[in-house]
Amino acid sequence: MRILLAEPRGFCAGVDRAIAIVLKALEKFGPPIYVRHEIVHNRWVVEHLRNQGAVFVHELDEIPDGAVAIYSAHGVSKAVQAEGERRPLHILDATCPLVDKVHREAERLDHDHYQVLLIGHAGHPEVEGTMGQLQQARMKLISHPDDVAQLRLSNPQKVAYITQTTLSVDETRAMVAQLKARFPTIKEPAKEDICYATQNRQNAVKALAQASDLILVLGAPNSSNSNRLREVAEQHGCRAFLIENAKDVEIQWLEGVETLGITAGASAPEILVEELLAHLHAEQHQVELLSVTKEYLAFPLPLELRE
């Protein structure tokens, strides 16, 4: 069997930074360090950090006064920020800088009196954080093409859209086309909000799909970008499965497969790829790299955690 490894795959710069913030905080302040929500959507990462002293909570009211508290890479609402400032907590913000860029964009649009539309998945932590940057009526969520037709805006001439950073590039493009058809003067982001890593990993999967009989995507079931990778593979004509680790692979999937493509979501560590290759006895197969681009971006840590 031929095995194709997508490049790029796995951790993006925002995930690298978020995990490093937790590790540096543990090193500097000692455990326990509290993290609001999963720092990134990956069970292996969460358990690895939990074993080192990180405590994951749903809300800030679960954190004792005086503790170190970290916001996850997905970002938080203004209300959560205000609660963190009100409480005697030592706050560290691991929000991805590209998510933070979308937050600032929403604020600027609101300041300029635009009705803001957010294209994203309802219930996702990033969407909840972005929606929470403005008062409720000032931002509307578009999760499905049908939502566009149902929009009722007080001033259709003064409308702008932003997007969740981890969406399918192709599906978002189609939804944007619908918005433009309904609101010809709609204001677009100065630069596309879907992050570089999401786009790069989807492009790599498109290339994998052309060359593979089956694609395995390593990632968590609640990871938006990992789910999109599986969907992109299927939309480009290739069978695909989202798996959390090598144990999820079912032997019948591999029957008749001559070329297997492997990739990993932006929150999936490379060790999971290595374990999958070992599980497949990769040394007995032809393993190749399928590269569509290289990534060199890195985000700095908060000042107090820099060495």
UniProtKB/Swiss-Prot annotation:
Binding residue positions for [4Fe-4S] cluster: 12, 96, 195
Binding sites annotated in the UniProt record for dimethylallyl diphosphate: 41, 74, 124, 223-225, 267
Cofactor note: Binds 1 [4Fe-4S] cluster per subunit.
GO BP terms in the entry: dimethylallyl diphosphate biosynthetic process; isopentenyl diphosphate biosynthetic process, methylerythritol 4-phosphate pathway; terpenoid biosynthetic process
EC number of the protein: 1.17.7.4
Pathway(s) annotated for this protein in UniProt: Isoprenoid biosynthesis; dimethylallyl diphosphate biosynthesis; dimethylallyl diphosphate from (2E)-4-hydroxy-3-methylbutenyl diphosphate: step 1/1; Isoprenoid biosynthesis; isopentenyl diphosphate biosynthesis via DXP pathway; isopentenyl diphosphate from 1-deoxy-D-xylulose 5-phosphate: step 6/6
Entry cofactors: [4Fe-4S] cluster
Keywords annotated in UniProt: 4Fe-4S, Iron, Iron-sulfur, Isoprene biosynthesis, Metal-binding, Oxidoreductase
Binding site for (2E)-4-hydroxy-3-methylbut-2-enyl diphosphate: 41, 74, 124, 165, 223-225, 267
Catalytic activity field: isopentenyl diphosphate + 2 oxidized [2Fe-2S]-[ferredoxin] + H2O = (2E)-4-hydroxy-3-methylbut-2-enyl diphosphate + 2 reduced [2Fe-2S]-[ferredoxin] + 2 H(+); dimethylallyl diphosphate + 2 oxidized [2Fe-2S]-[ferredoxin] + H2O = (2E)-4-hydroxy-3-methylbut-2-enyl diphosphate + 2 reduced [2Fe-2S]-[ferredoxin] + 2 H(+)
Binding site for isopentenyl diphosphate: 41, 74, 124, 223-225, 267
Alphabetical list of InterPro entries matching this protein: LytB/IspH (IPR003451)
Active site location: 126
Pfam families recorded: LYTB
Gene3D superfamilies from the UniProt entry: 3.40.50.11270, 4-hydroxy-3-methylbut-2-enyl diphosphate reductase, catalytic domain
Molecular function GO labels: 4 iron, 4 sulfur cluster binding; 4-hydroxy-3-methylbut-2-enyl diphosphate reductase activity; metal ion binding
Highest taxon listed in the record's lineage: Bacteria
Statement: the UniProt record of this protein carries the keyword Ligase: no
Keyword Metal-binding attributed: yes
Family per similarity comment: Belongs to the IspH family.
NCBIfam families referenced in this protein's UniProt entry, alphabetically: ispH_lytB, PRK01045.1-2, PRK01045.1-4
Known role: Catalyzes the conversion of 1-hydroxy-2-methyl-2-(E)-butenyl 4-diphosphate (HMBPP) into a mixture of isopentenyl diphosphate (IPP) and dimethylallyl diphosphate (DMAPP). Acts in the terminal step of the DOXP/MEP pathway for isoprenoid precursor biosynthesis.
Entry protein name: 4-hydroxy-3-methylbut-2-enyl diphosphate reductase
Organism of origin: Magnetococcus marinus (strain ATCC BAA-1437 / JCM 17883 / MC-1)
Lineage of producing organism: Bacteria, Pseudomonadati, Pseudomonadota, Alphaproteobacteria, Magnetococcales
